[in-house]
A protein has these predicted regions:
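N-terminal pre-catalytic "stem/leader" segment of glycosyltransferase-like enzymes
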Residues: 2-95
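Conserved catalytic-core segment of nucleotide-activated headgroup transferases in glycan assembly
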Residues: 42-56, 60, 183-288
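Membrane-proximal helix-turn-helix segments that form the acceptor-binding/catalytic region
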Residues: 107-108, 138-158
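Acceptor-binding helix/loop patch of EC 2.4 sugar-transfer enzymes
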Residues: 118-145, 187-203, 208-211, 220-222, ...
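Nucleotide-sugar-dependent
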Residues: 126, 226-234, 280, 284-317, ...
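A short, active-site helix/loop in glycosyltransferases that binds the activated sugar's phosphate group
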Residues: 149-178, 185-192, 259-261, 332, ...
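A charged, aromatic-enriched C-terminal amphipathic alpha-helix characteristic of glycosyltransferases
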Residues: 198, 355-396
């Protein structure tokens, strides 16, 4: 009461506690997430693949109320952590001490009824990692080769990014429970980057007026023989000469790294170079460079056939046409080449006039509209993965994608 008046009453009315029809009280105060399925993720790192394959899907699953997921790089041996979970997904574990942890997890999984899923988005067996790859050293030791294979064999399921990698690991390890889930970019990260007016403005400025189109390659140093271990036989070995010959025709732009034989042109400013950006800043960096097209060369080897088409996805989201190596890696790409000369011909063809160019831009952007992570059918693939065993009839989306 306040000054003799019951709180909630007004003059001439019945106090709240005396009303004959009190407001119904909620019967279930359980938070909605309490009844959702739960799973755990163990990341390999916090670099690009950690986000593409683990962190971004985990964030989306939690944000859209599909399930409750927790992720970490810290291995936990407290058995109570694993009560009531559906599955654990482990990314690119390879060392002997990680094998010991997985052996312990295997016993917990068998006792508690959860599944172990191994995630890998690259070739990590040393015999198929190219000599020019600067990260090869991390997988050269005998114990790493043995531990990584053993862990894949021990898991109930393996997830990869493409069909070629599915066949590769199935052949190498004997584990046939391998599921392809492509790389799905978050729409909040890339979906707002398409700007048709800016694309046309960049064409008018650099192609029509200055007659020197800006051509971009954005990628890590893993594609280049930075330590000169392979006599410069890297992913640009077959296109280097045409880049050298066309520095007056195109403004070549490299982000992240560049082939060592082009170093003098980079130092002189004839080839433009920009350091790598943080992952969340990468789309803005590429957009700020005002490029007219992109390229994605690869040499044909097992390692590259197992690669995913991230460069095609990123460029298409921005509406920048990309010319990709004609390999299984880029089977979805719209413009493909085999030799360096073909790469130049493809660039000239798509840039030849504004009408043709804009058709390429729009077609590229439309080609990836079904690839957004937040698309219900894409997000539900992850839900099926974490909650249902391999080949289960209710995994309709994954079974269709993997032709099971």
């Amino acid at each position: 009461m306040v000054h003799g008046t019951v709180i909630g009453s007004v003059v001439g009315s019945t106090p709240l506690q005396q009303r004959s029809n009190p407001a119904p009280q909620p019967r279930n105060l359980r938070p909605p997430e309490q009844d959702l399925p739960r799973s755990l993720n163990y990341y390999a790192d916090y670099s690009g693949c950690g986000f593409w394959r683990m962190i971004w899907p985990e964030h989306a699953m939690n944000a859209y109320g599909k399930m409750v997921q927790i992720g970490s790089t810290v291995m936990t041996r407290d058995p109570n952590v694993y009560n009531g979970i559906k599955s654990i997904r482990l990314q690119r574990q390879a060392s002997p001490h990680q094998l010991k942890f997985l052996e312990w997890l295997r016993t917990q999984a068998d006792q508690r009824g959860f599944r172990l899923i191994y995630e890998i988005d690259d070739v990590m067996f040393r015999e198929d990692i190219p000599e020019y790859n600067k990260f090869r050293f991390a997988f050269e030791a005998d114990e790493v080769r043995a531990a990584s294979q053993r862990m894949i064999e021990m898991c109930d399921e393996v997830t990869v990014t493409c069909n070629y990698m599915k066949e590769y690991y199935g052949h190498k390890t004997g584990n046939s429970n391998i599921t392809v889930i492509p790389n799905y970019p978050p729409k909040w990260w890339l979906g707002h980057m398409y700007d048709e007016q800016l694309i046309m403005k960049n064409y008018d400025r650099h192609v029509k007026k200055r007659r020197k189109p800006r051509i971009l390659y954005a990628g890590s140093g893993a594609h280049f023989d930075v330590d000169n271990k392979a006599n410069q036989q890297d992913d640009f070995a077959h296109v280097r000469d045409v880049i050298l010959k066309t520095v007056k025709d195109f403004q070549w732009v490299f982000v992240g790294a560049y082939p060592l034989p082009l170093q003098n042109l980079v130092k002189s400013g004839k080839i433009e170079f920009h350091p790598w950006a943080k992952l969340y800043d990468l789309p803005e960096l590429i957009k700020s460079l005002k490029v007219n097209a992109m390229v994605a060369p690869l040499i044909d080897n097992t390692f590259n056939r197992c690669k995913s088409d991230i460069k095609f996805v990123e460029s298409s989201a921005l509406g920048v046409p990309i010319v990709c190596q004609d390999m299984v890696t880029y089977e979805n790409a719209l413009n493909k080449f085999t030799t360096g000369e073909e790469m130049i011909d493809q660039l000239k063809d798509l840039l030849r006039d504004k009408t043709t160019y804009m058709k390429h831009c729009r077609k590229a952007n439309m080609a990836i509209q079904n690839r957004w992570l937040e698309t219900p059918s894409n997000l539900d693939k992850y839900l099926e993965l974490y909650t249902l065993p391999y080949g289960h009839p209710n995994r309709k989306l994954l079974n269709r994608l993997n032709r099971l």
